[in-house]
Amino acid sequence: MKNPRRLAIAALSGVILVGLVAATASARISSPAKQAASIKACVLLPDTVTSTRYTLFDAPYLKAAFKKAGVPALILNAHKDPQKQKSQAQQCLAQGAKVALFDQLDPASGASITDLLVAGGAKVIDYDRLVVGSKASYYVSFDNPTVGKLMAKGIIAAMKAKKIYGKHPVVSELNGDIKDNNAKQFKQGYDSVLNPLFKNGTFKKAASGDQWTDWDAIKGRRIFDQILARNGNKVNASIAANDGLAGAIISSLKAHGLKPIPVSGQDATPTGVQYILAGWQSGTVYKSVRKEANAAAAAAIAIVKGKKVPGVNGTVSGTKSIILTPVWVTKKNYKLLFKEGFLKRSQVCIGQYKKLCK
């Protein structure tokens, strides 16, 4: 049961003030003036709609890192509202933020908010998503083209295991949001593997089978229903750009009375791992949010303390970057998620899936 006192605080303050307030990252603030110049760092997270990772993982990991370093920080979530994210950026500046970890919602608002933060005297670290061509000082994320390559190689391995590789399988793609630079990089990655196979006839692309979904699983389900209809229910494998879209494909297959096909995923969600154990999903790309959050927090803390930013290992679109390596998770190595504390057995190995955990 949640602590009633914490709920009350969350309703009134709407912030996570590291070291000072234990509240959710998604509520509203009522009187920011009272906390003016009270923070050194700020985190602007994008939403709770397309992924639960921001509330379940990013916010608590970042909160812990800033608290350990003794750096007061404000963590906010825009709930997929660009205007709200802009207001939150203004709030961060009003409260004295010297550095902002910024995960944009879309390129247009992302560039505008970055300009706002920089003009207000804050250094910007693009977190997870890069605002291309912006004034950000650093970028922290995973190797996104490699994420896409892992997906493509994952479903290819599954097709070989099912002995349908070499039989001209029909393959579809459910992409993320065309406005999301990460989604475009994921697609760049899996297309670099799949397009040569489409071109030489090894695979056949499903009719109407390359669609953008806005990271919306409901829309993804509707689109995949249409893809099945256009292809006489004969789709042999599919890219799903995250576990939510994989779930949309799986629900569509079940509704049509069809058997499992190779399906990719991303984010290593409890449901995604359960589908992997049950044989409905081939795998999921695991990106250690803990490592990403800790790397980003370390960069922000270094800036606040006037020290050299650790871990810089490249440049992306002219921005100094800290790029991390993703992992493809299957039935063979899913326990890595438990070992690293990303998921708990109690989240996955329950109900009908308990007997599948070995």
What is each of the regions a protein language model found here?
Residues K2-R6, A27-K358:
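A residue-level marker of the well-folded mature domains of exported/periplasmic proteins
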Residues K2-R28:
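Secretory targeting and sorting signals
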